[in-house]
Amino acid sequence: AHVDPSTRTPMPRLIGAHTIDIGGIPMAARRAGNAGMTALQIFSAIPKYYNEKAGVKPERVTAFHAALAEAGIARTAVIVHAGYVLNCATPDAEKWERAATALTKELERSTTLQVRGVCFHPGAATDNDRDAGVARVATAMTRALETVDGATKLLVENSAGAGNTIGRTVQEVAGILTSLPPSLRARAGYGLDTCHLFASG
């Protein structure tokens, strides 16, 4: 169906980057503000680990919100990138359980921070069963969204397509999102990595 462009609500033009958080996430917000950014991406915990037990202390939340306000950056202009080790597409039951638990914890931390969303890499279907990999990612997302209440979204990031990684095509990303229960879909979406898009062809 044709949509008249004049009836669309313009989206805010946000410019940001993944910002280094040495000194804590409040410092990431200050660095972003000092660079003139209007958005930023951060890690809520060390990205090389699962961080299934890591939480966010109330004083850290308060300091982060104050730094965002000082920088003139809205909480809704902040994305958290999940840890790199998560593989929600894996057929290995033990590894999947750990990844799904870590994704839920990531959503919990990000909801506590009151940011817009959590962007994560779906992982790899190491058994070469791409459809099953898509289903496993959707199951992990469903668990996280059912466990954690709030407005923070889970965003599937497209992959560069190396090996058996899931999310190299629009169809795979859409397959994940449409596999979610309809009641949860408003809290899910995708993060478009243009470098990954180019690399995947």
Where are the regions that the model predicts?
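Active-site acidic/histidine proton-transfer and metal-coordination neighborhood
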Residues: 88-190
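N-terminal pre-domain/capping segments
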Residues: 2-80, 86-108
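Conserved long hydrophobic alpha-helices within structured protein cores
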Residues: 34-37, 171, 193
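Structural preference for beta-strand elements that scaffold enzyme active sites
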Residues: 12-16, 39-41, 75-79, 115-119, ...
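Short, exposed beta-strand "edge-strand" segments with a Pro/Gly-rich flavor and a Y/T-containing core
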Residues: 50-56, 162-168, 200-201
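Active-site beta-loop-alpha junctions enriched in small/polar residues
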Residues: 18-22, 45-47, 83-85, 123-125, ...
